[in-house]
Amino acid sequence: MSEQAQAKRKVQIGDKLRGADKVRTIPMVNEETGYQRKPDWIRVRVPANGEIQRIKSLLRKQKLHTVCEEAACPNLPECFGGGTATFMIMGDICTRRCAFCDVGFGRPNALDAQEPLHLAESVENLGLNYVVITSVDRDDLADGGAEHFAECIRQVRALTPETRIEILTPDFRPCLDTAVEILAETAPDVFNHNIETVPELYKHIRPGARYQHSLDLLKRYKALRPDVSTKSGIMVGLGETFEQVINTIKDLRTHDVDMITIGQYLQPSKHHAPVDRFVHPDEFREYARVANELGFTSVASGPMVRSSYHADLQHKGVDVGLYKP
């Protein structure tokens, strides 16, 4: 099948597009790029893979997915090697085509009603004290999947009530009010939604989302559940300026976000948005200094920091980036 014919072919339920097929319609300057050489401060530790294979085997048995695998997270060896994982619910097919993300795009399958129970059983079997639950975007669902999130929270609390739960949600367009009310009623310990990048880059990097909508989601949730910590994350190295990042940090704080993560964007494939630059550790320290001065309760800022990286320590206020107050 020719490339033109592939582009015109209707995506069927269950189809998952990745790489060039996924990002073909995104208005990017470069549709295909090479990779920049990584600087010395970008390092990924690779431990023995016995624990990694054990966790993967358990997840496949329970028909579960992790964002660690689907999004090609560079910290997968460290997190899996330490016996932790971020679970990705509602399948592995996303209804959005973000230029930075390696999760597949397409028409998702129906929700698995047994997934919340399987997730809770895996949390119990892995002995997790802290679990992060995230998802693909599900624009095909009336509530964006909020009730499925809530059922996952209920099932985990039923089996392991001592486990702390963080949810990393999509933006719930266009069902913000419904989703927020559902998740305010069945609340996690941390409500996380990533702003991802500065507003000036949304058209090219996050074309299916709206910057102000994401800010409104975070503020609305905090208004309904002031007892629950709110959290958001920013990627840098996509072409933004220092001043734009500072403004985004300030926007998050003025929208009542408590915790923030700032990390280096790494290109998942040659078809994704290219790395504009590798941000020096000193710049991450400056972002952290500003964030601390603005009053965030937890700041994680460093090249390898990701939203879910050592999320348990972030929740406790432990520094997992570069900045030392």
Swiss-Prot record:
Iron-sulfur in keyword set: yes
Keyword GTP-binding (UniProt): no
Pathway note: Protein modification; protein lipoylation via endogenous pathway; protein N(6)-(lipoyl)lysine from octanoyl-[acyl-carrier-protein]: step 2/2
Named cofactor requirement(s): [4Fe-4S] cluster
Cofactor binding notes: Binds 2 [4Fe-4S] clusters per subunit. One cluster is coordinated with 3 cysteines and an exchangeable S-adenosyl-L-methionine.
Pfam family of the protein (one): LIAS_N
GO terms under cellular component: cytoplasm
Entry EC number(s): 2.8.1.8
HAMAP family xref list: Lipoyl_synth
Protein name: Lipoyl synthase
Organism: Alcanivorax borkumensis (strain ATCC 700651 / DSM 11573 / NCIMB 13689 / SK2)
